[in-house]
Amino acid sequence: VLLAAGNGVAQQNYSKSEGLLQYVDPYIGSGYHGHIFVGTSVPYGMVQLGPTNIHKGWDWCSGYHYSDSILIGFSHTHLSGTGCTDLCDILIMPLNEIRTPRGNQDDIRDGYASRYSHANEIRPEYYSLLLDRYNIKAELTATDRVGFHRYTYPEGKPASILIDLREGNGSNAYDSYIRKVDDYTVEGYRYVRGWSPSRKVYFVLKSDKKIEQFTAYDDNTPQPWDQLKVASVKSVLTFGNVKEVKIKVALSSVSCDNAAMNLQSELTHWDFDKVVDMSADRWNKQLEKMTVETDDEASKRVFY
């Protein structure tokens, strides 16, 4: 089954992975009708943080398809291998130009979407991608309930991120909310009816850089308040002329307060590489529960 779902892409550089994790190829199943999520997570984690394409039908059930080359951001929940379309909640897109329309597959120039190539690095504990349009390097990792982002911006333009609470995979929010809590914290939620009749996803976002400007949008119309509750909430956070921004996004299905507690219990520091190493250790321990003895490297990659 794994061979049938695989897309035959070349192996990436897994030199940083050790143990059985070095044999994992996250691209297997991301083409054809595989419906496999591509991104980063920990075993059985609530967060599956990874790239999201514009939804174009059944082959995009996970929010991503290997044939695609247009990215609308990084969302924190993805289905994998289900054949059903849903999730892709709490979409984050790093920007150095303020844009709030999404854009479309045929012409992205009027929106925030960006082209990308597959010359990136992906392992279960780490995902990295260069946004061609903005020349921004994105790096992602995760704990159980927290997505950890590290963005490196080119010089000369203010560093920003877009939060799109309307956008989902095949289903848009019917209610959403965002609030600036302080100069480093934003919270909100997204209510959606999709394949699941009703889902509620709450989040708290913290940045390591001061939010110099917070703008909430009703779809693409800016609003003058530090909080907003409408069906199509978007927000742009601007950090000024900084080289690097780290953000942590904690999730809860209960409340924003619970999301804040999840963040406090799982990730109080800002050491991105430490979280990558922690995730790698957890994956290796999980993979070590079953081993295969063979000298065939390709068979190991298919198995793991």
Language model features: what each stretch is:
Residues 1-12:
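Bacterial Sec-dependent N-terminal signal peptides
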Residues 12-304:
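Accessory carbohydrate-recognition regions in carbohydrate-active enzymes
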